[in-house]
Amino acid sequence: MASWLYECLCEAELAQYYPHFTALGLQKIDELAKVTMKDYSRLGVHDMNDRKRLFQLIKIIKIMQEEDKALGIPEHPLQASSLYTKPREFRSGPRRQLHFDSPSASKDKMANNETGSLSNFSVDEQKSTYLKVLEHMLPDDSQCQTKIRAPDASAADASMQTETNAPLFSSNYFSPQLGNCDIPVIQRVSHVSGYNYGIPHSCVRQITSENPWTEMEKIRVCVRKRPLGVREVRRGEVNVITVEDKETLLVHEKKEAVDLTQYILQHVFYFDEVFGEACSNQDVYLKTAHPLIQHIFNGGSATCFAYGQTGAGKTYTMIGTHQNPGLYALAAKDIFRQLKVSQSRRNLFVWISFYEIYCGQLYDLLNRRKRLFAREDSKHVVQIAGLRELQVDSVELLLQVILKGSKERSTGATGVNADSSRSHAIIQIQIKDSAKRTFGRISFIDLAGSERAADARDSDRQTKMEGAEINQSLLALKECIRALDQEHTHTPFRQSKLTQVLKDSFIGNAKTCMIANISPSHIATEHTLNTLRYADRVKELKKGVKCCASATSQNQTSANASPKRIQSSPVTLPGDKCSPKKVKLGLQQSLTVAPGPTKVKAHPLASHVPNVPFTSGPKTPGKKSSSRGSPTPEWDMKASPRKGTTRSGHSIKKGAESAPLCSEKSQIGSKIAVGWEGRASDPGEGLLRVRLPTRGKKVQPVQPVQKQLLSRPRLLANSHHLEATQDSKVGTPAGLAPEAWTNPILQQKEREEHLRFYHQQFQQPPLLKQKLNYQPLQRLLCQHRPSEGRLQSETGFPLHSNPENRDGAQAEDLDDSDFSEDSFSHGSSQPAMKQGSTALERSGSSFFLHQDREHSPEEQAAERQQCLLFSSETDGSKKRPADSWVYSRDPIISHRRGALSQSHSPSMVCPDWSKEEDSASSGPSPKDNRAQKPSSSQVDFVHHQKPGEAQVSDIRLEAFTSEVPEQAEGSLSSPSPENGLSFPLSHVAVSGSPDQRDRVCTPLREVSENRVTHTPGRVNSSTPFQEDSGEQIQMCSANASGLMAPLTMSLLETPCHEDLSSLEQIAQDGAGYGFMAEIVGGPAAGHTVPSYDQEAALPVSSATECLWLSSSPPDNRPSGDLPALSPSPIHQHSPDKLPGREAYQTRRPILLPENHMGSKLYDDRAEETELGGSLTFPRKPSSNIHAGVPYSTPFLTSCTGSSNGVGRPWAQERKHPTGVSCQELVSSTDSNKPHYNEDIAWLRHRPISRCLDSDSPVVPSCSSKALRTYCPLTPEQAQQVIIRAHKEQLDEMAELDLKEETLMTQMDSNDFEDFVTQLDEIMALKSRCIQSLRSQLQLYLTSHRPAAAPERTVVS
């Protein structure tokens, strides 16, 4: 055999190695066949060519041996004479298999080798020869780059020893059946940091330390290898994963070269921790999640999530089994143990929540898969809205909760796993104190398994969607990790719900541990490599976090602040710029407002006249209203551009962050800015100045108005200032040169006209357009105009306003009202305020101007022209004469109304009228302006109305005032707030008819003249606005504005009361609706406004009309009721005034056209819907809200929370002798034009005296005959109203029943108190709903039981 060996070597030109072979014990050819590439260096074969020849020789010998086997020649077992290799037994299988022996096994075998002489080979020589062999075997394979890791010195020996001692190759690794296949070459590839992911980083191992990893690292990446399953072993799957040590992992990937040569690509990965199949969940927990527990007890947050392919062991790791609990259970035990051990932590409790993310949606697994929503709080921390949290006091209970949730989780069969998790499950364990304040939080996330679409078997559409969503979310997670690793300014956390929920796991004071789970099967090699590469990417992030920790920490605006979040932080340093998020109407967001009151940068709109200055008030963007705490002087005469800017930017609302936006907005609405400035300026001084600038800024009214809160005391103190402020609102700061605002620029006018026209068309529903017929109203207005003119002459209000200012303000108002109505409908309260303020400013400002110094004929004419233009543009069909008349009245009415609006609709004004209100309020008192708009329906409806509507409102007010001059004056003039308010209210209630409105306006104006500041406030509220009206109005406006559409809101908000309680009371009584309007000059005025506005403003906004319409019926009813209900001046009005009101009422039918009525009713419903939200407030919405709400809708009543008919004043009125209510209800309920007409007629008919009369709640003085005469409602209509109300009540009750059932199903013993609270709320709503329906039924019965039922029906 030796000769044969020598001959073979000679044939292969390797004869020179024969002596060395024999010296090492190679005597036979069969023994030579056992030589592996690893033995070449030991055999002395170092030359690459010789090695090739030796390899070919061995290959031929093996082929011959296999041929002998095939011929049946018995194979003599080879002795392990070769020191290099020892035959290994391998399991045969149906397919080619890869058998890899672990390095430790190789070492053991080598140790048992007969020859130990090879140990004298130096390690260096072995390494060099080994590398040469690899290079020789695959010299041209660019894919196989042999990257030998240069381990630390401490690990060099062991690592190298492993590589050299383990047989590099063994034929046993490959199927012996493939005799003619070349022996594969193993290529080792080390995946160091940066490998295949971009720029390589130096791979520096962290020196092991006894300290927990949480003290040194932000993210820890571990890998866990599961063992082969029984089924996998049965199928013959091979383990291709080798865990070399606790940080190193090898993956043996079988590959095939282009020439069909098979080779093994050995991937080497390094991680913070590698767990083999022998590791238990306890072992994994101690190295991963255990250090996180101490971190959360230190006040931090922690996340531990498992990632990997379907079936890799993620769920087992995180949730585990009853015998081998998962990480969350082990963590819970640790938490409870620490809570018991530490005395200082005895007052802490453990809360658990469990939800999943399935197909991009969140579901609560502890609450019957209730749909959840992920939102960010003010600190940009993600909160899960609606998530059910359970308090657990033991690990057993916690395990039961998790078990319950696990049963609800979405799972499904896939091609890889029969029970695969198809959703991401998040178990959140929180530590809270007795006040339920979160002390620490740890989340365990079991991610859904990633998979390839090619692996899916028999997948239907749902399965494909699941897989796509899972992969998309995991990809988004990878993108977030990449962005964080590369320190991008933007991290796409919102690309998926998963990343949104996990956002806090990667930023801020959060520690994260990722456990990559892998399967050992060779079939899953590709999945395993993808998982390991993914984890390696996170490991790089971990390293990057250390480097950029300072960058992350430097943004400490919040505990969890990302660079992006920090950049967008709402807090702006003085002088810092904050670009608005939105640019409105092409306005440039060039205006930057610094917190400092004086520091402001303003860039005029392209359309804005450059000469119009922006002023900043002392108010800082961060403050809601600098005037709030500051004395009036702060606002005095300060033409601070900033104020206007701030207001525009809604700085009051949003604070410093909004300041930038405010700047932009203020640019957009310089008029608004001016209004704010006016407010800022002393109410008395700045009125004129502010108004003047307002003209110049009217282009900017397009911008939404920001609310400014003024202290109620200041408002009360400076009622007059309030009015002046309103005017000043309209105008620019007193400090600004009036000439800049004196001459409106053509561009501004065109802009205003365009915006007005656009908003009118945009906001008017086709129904309203068809029904609008303002001719009659205009005629009425014209008829009443004389009285208004008289009133004007009589009531020279000491308002400081320039006709120019007024004009500017008017134009501005028009634009603002239009724009605010259209685009700044925030509850329409802001727009309404803006409109109202503009309208008020316009009419009010001009009115103030007139009052200040009675407008010269020229000024009045100019104002009228503006008003007419606006009205005509807005109303279209309206007659110019009426408009002009209205406007001519407007100055007075405006002033009154402006003052009234300010005082009585502070809330409304505050939100939407913020500039007006702020100016007024700022002068008098910032807090008066709180966010609530005055309830004044006039103001509100004006705001919501287009500028035309505002004019109409003004006209109505003026008409009402002029018509009821004596009464109004009497009541208004009376110093008592009640008188002032009550009279206007009654007039307002009556204001449904232009005459009535005029009357009210006149008295109000006169009163205002007598006590401009006080009367308007009183008019706005029963008591002077300064006293209670501000708060009430604010509340009302807040409710109305938030809940209603811009127009509807304004109408609803318009009604303002001196006292919310009084308003609520009135609403409860059923008079509240009308009462509010009346008090504010709203329901009635608002209602009246509907009539007027229907003529003048209907074109502007059907919604506004609707509000008015709804207000007027309720107003009528409430008006009657109001006197009885509240101590408001309306009630106080003596019956003698009632006749006058009745007269006004008679006029009202004329004022309100049927079309208007119908449209109002239509809008009213819409309003009601909106109001419904506001009405829902536990406290009854201000009557103005009620007024805005359709009285016929039961929902409103219940929502309003005033079952008495607050929601449905008309119902209450029905209860009262007033015959109006039933018919009103029908008309309001009916969307048909006839019904509206009837309602309008009723409104016209309804006796103002009722509203004004304080003696009788329903003012019986209004005869049912008169009501019937004016607005007869047929019994059929009344029945229809009742039927409809009953149906609505049934629907609402059904909805409440459903809520109650849902609440019962969700009842939890741990939260029984909360359950009782919610149940009580539901019962209260039911009670209100029932009471509302009963009110309507009683009203119907009172109207139809008497013999004179027809009359009452008509009235109703």
Curated annotation (Swiss-Prot):
Superkingdom of this protein's organism:
Eukaryota
Region of interest (Disordered), residue spans:
93-119, 552-581, 597-664, 788-840, 897-947, 964-998, 1109-1140
**Region ranges (Interaction with MPHOSPH9):** 473-702
**Compositionally biased region (Polar residues):** 552-571, 830-840, 970-979
Its chief place of residence is cytoplasm
Q: Where is ATP bound in this sequence?
A: 308-315
InterPro entries assigned to the protein according to its UniProt record, in alphabetical order: Kinesin-like_fam, Kinesin_motor_CS, Kinesin_motor_dom, Kinesin_motor_dom_sf, P-loop_NTPase, SAM, SAM/pointed_sf
Give yes or no: UniProt keyword Cell membrane: no
Q: Which residues form the SAM domain?
A: 1-64
Q: Which spans does this entry mark as compositional bias, Acidic residues?
A: 810-821
Q: Which residues carry this modification: Phosphoserine?
A: 102, 473, 579, 616, 640, 817, 820, 1008
Instruction: Tell me where it resides.
Output: Cytoplasm, Cytoskeleton, Microtubule organizing center, Centrosome, Centriole; Cytoplasm, Cytoskeleton, Microtubule organizing center, Centrosome
- Quaternary organization: Interacts with CCP110, CEP97, TALPID3. Interacts with MPHOSPH9.
Q: What is this protein called?
A: Kinesin-like protein KIF24
